[in-house]
Amino acid sequence: MATSHGPLRVGVGGPVGSGKTALMDLLCKTMRERYDIAAITNDIYTKWDAEFLVRSGSLTPDRIAGVETGGCPHTAIREDASMNLAAVADMRAKFPGLDLVLIESGGDNLAATFSPELADLTIYVIDVAAGDKIPSKGGPGITRSDLLVINKIDLAPHVGASLEKMETDARRMRGARPFVMTNLKKSEGLDRIVGFIEAKGGLKRAG
């Protein structure tokens, strides 16, 4: 996607353990044959998520960067996105033909959002295991992200969560904004997320 700042930048946020890194991994592996991709992860004091993506073979190591945010992880994607913007600029310098940069936030709360300066599209991941009340609690991630991903639907019977309630609440809180129910462990719902990024982000498939 040719924008004034180069590649399409997709922010992936959500609470710790919701499946953000799993989604990053799957998106890289699914889309890398068709697009020129880089990935940036945010961790407070380590580069664990970036290292996971390298070990998993999501992309070649030179296409994966880890940002150590220190302190408050959501500041690095919102109030002061300079470290992430620098990481994006570095990737663009290395790979001038980049189509897509995926940016994973550090584990954050329901109030964390990406700066529009940093992300063109935002995906917010929550998981069923955290309880079926999560969509009704609102917060910018739930209500204003471009796409809400409700992950780990396979766990619903084990944690007594109602998927129907989660769908109803998500629809009520988000209005016309889309959401997807997923089991990323089995790639269920992944095609809809990829389709959303391609359509909403205006990506043109190579070849």
UniProtKB/Swiss-Prot annotation:
- A Pfam family matched by this chain, by name? cobW
Instruction: Output the InterPro entries linked to this UniProt entry.
Output: CobW/HypB/UreG_nucleotide-bd, P-loop_NTPase, UreG
Instruction: List localization entries.
Output: Cytoplasm
Q: Cross-referenced CDD domains, in alphabetical order?
A: UreG
Q: Which residues bind GTP?
A: G14, P15, V16, G17, S18, G19, K20, T21
What keywords is this UniProt entry annotated with?
Chaperone, Cytoplasm, GTP-binding, Nickel insertion, Nucleotide-binding
Q: What is its main location?
A: cytoplasm
Q: Tell me which Gene Ontology terms the entry assigns under biological process.
A: urea catabolic process
**Gene Ontology molecular function terms on file:** GTP binding; GTPase activity; nickel cation binding
GO CC terms of this entry: cytoplasm
What is the recorded function of this protein according to its Swiss-Prot or TrEMBL entry?
Facilitates the functional incorporation of the urease nickel metallocenter. This process requires GTP hydrolysis, probably effectuated by UreG.
Quaternary structure and partners? Homodimer. UreD, UreF and UreG form a complex that acts as a GTP-hydrolysis-dependent molecular chaperone, activating the urease apoprotein by helping to assemble the nickel containing metallocenter of UreC. The UreE protein probably delivers the nickel.
Family that this chain belongs to: Belongs to the SIMIBI class G3E GTPase family. UreG subfamily.
Record-linked HAMAP family: UreG (MF_01389)
Report the protein name in the record: Urease accessory protein UreG
What are the top taxonomic ranks of the organism? Answer: Bacteria, Pseudomonadati, Pseudomonadota, Alphaproteobacteria, Hyphomicrobiales
The primary gene name is ureG
